[in-house]
A protein has these predicted regions:
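Nucleotide-sugar donor-binding catalytic core of glycosyltransferases
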Residues: 1-6, 14, 22-30, 54-216
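Loop/turn elements at helix/coil->beta-strand transitions in domains of secreted/extracellular proteins
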Residues: 15-16, 40-43, 182
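Active-site proximal beta-strand in glycosyltransferases
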Residues: 36-52
């Protein structure tokens, strides 16, 4: 309720032409309706988590339920799951594919120019964005794949975060570990879908490291 009141007050001050809902859909329908009627504002929503049933990505169903809320009031959607893979009640004309964005102010390492890359392959696993520790008793197919890879190719110098009690690193710590490596591996949970990837691919490719993706 409080956030709705704050947004209504902000809109009274700015009278926006467009409102972008960034990876959330928490406004009440009545608030959206009020803003649209008062200021003819357009609403758009971007979302970058799994939405495709066929891919069986993490929490895809609850993610889909979230974006379908207020679907009669939201004018357009920008999604990192390709619309061809999404079965939804949302009008398909509203759905647009959004490649995972790269920001040159953040992804600026230019690793291809780094001279002291003494490790071969980088991979980072986590149990949630910016979640600082691994969740006890939780594992997934990516961890199993990495263990098999390390057993098959023991001579490769690996830099693996988030496996074998090595907690994830984020921000500066993540970039420091990445810059030590010649290559990286991007693995997505669930089955591969059209144009769909873990959002970590932006941090890898955007920073200029040679990146492998899974093909099954």
């Amino acid at each position: 309720k409080i956030i709705n009141e704050k947004i209504l007050n902000i809109c009274d001050n700015y009278r926006p032409n467009i409102i972008v809902l960034g990876h959330n859909n928490i406004l009440e329908g009545s608030s959206i309706n009020t803003i649209k009627k008062k200021y003819s504002s357009k609403f758009t929503l971007w979302y970058e988590d799994a939405l495709g049933k066929r891919g069986e990505g993490p929490n895809w169903k609850s993610n889909l339920n979230l974006i379908e809320k207020n679907r009669h009031l939201i004018d357009s959607y920008y999604l990192t799951t390709h619309p061809d893979e999404i079965k939804t009640y949302i009008n398909r004309k509203k759905l647009n594919f959004l490649p995972i964005p790269v920001d040159p102010n953040i992804e600026n390492l230019e690793i291809y120019n780094c001279k002291n890359r003494f490790k071969d392959l980088f991979f980072a696993l986590s149990h949630g964005v910016n979640f600082g520790r691994l969740k006890k008793g939780k594992n997934d197919e990516r961890e199993e794949f990495i263990q098999k890879l390390m057993n098959m190719y023991p001579n490769i110098k690996y830099n693996i975060l988030g496996i074998a009690d090595e907690n994830p690193k984020w921000n500066y710590g993540f970039f420091t570990e990445l810059s030590k490596c010649k290559m990286s591996l991007n693995l997505s949970r669930g089955h591969p879908l059209k144009y769909t990837s873990s959002n970590r691919i932006a941090a890898l490719v955007g920073n200029g490291i040679y990146t492998f993706i899974d093909k099954r």
